[in-house]
C-alpha cells in the first residue's frame, strides 16, 4: 500500500507519514523476527529526493521547519530558554523504540528534512548553525561545529555566558545558560559497530530505552526550566 501511494505521487509531507509507517514495519519485523524487506521504499525516496529536494527551500510550515537548516531560528521564535539535544544518526526506526522511555513525558513530534549530504559534518553543522552547506566555515570537518553554534546563538540574541555546547548525558548547565546544544553519539556509535543489522539495532536500542538515560536527561532540564528539543541530524 505504501509503494502504491508513492507511485501515485507524493508531496513532501507525505514522506513524513511514510517514514513513520516504514519505521513501524521495521520495528515489528525486528521484534517478531520477521523478514520484511522495505528497501524498495528507500529507493523510491531516493528518486524523489533527486527530483524534488531542491524545491524544499521554498516551502513553509508555521508548525515546524521544513529543512534542518532552519531549526535554530524556529526554536528561538517559540522559546527563550532551550536545550537542543542532537541524537547523532537517529532514524525514525530508532525513535520508534526510544520513545517508549518517554511514557511520563508529554511531547509533540514534528518531522523535517536533513541536509544533503546527510553526513554529520554537513547536516549537523547546518542544524546548529542555521546555515546551508555552502555557507559553513568547513562543511567537511566538525572542528568548527561548536564555533558555528555559538555564532548562531549570538546572532539569535544570546550572550556568550548564556550559551553552552556539550556532549553526553551528565552535563550540568550553569544558571546563566539560555541556549544549549547537547550532542549524544550513542546511536551513531551503535550503527558503526553493528554486525547484526536491523535486529542488532533493535536489541541495542531496546536496552538504551530501558536504561532511560535520554528521558532522565530531558526531565532534568525540564525541571530546570528549559524547553527540550530532541532531534536527529
Regions found by a protein language model. Give the residues of each.
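…; additionally, a secondary subgroup of soluble metalloenzymes is captured
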Residues: 1-83, 89-232
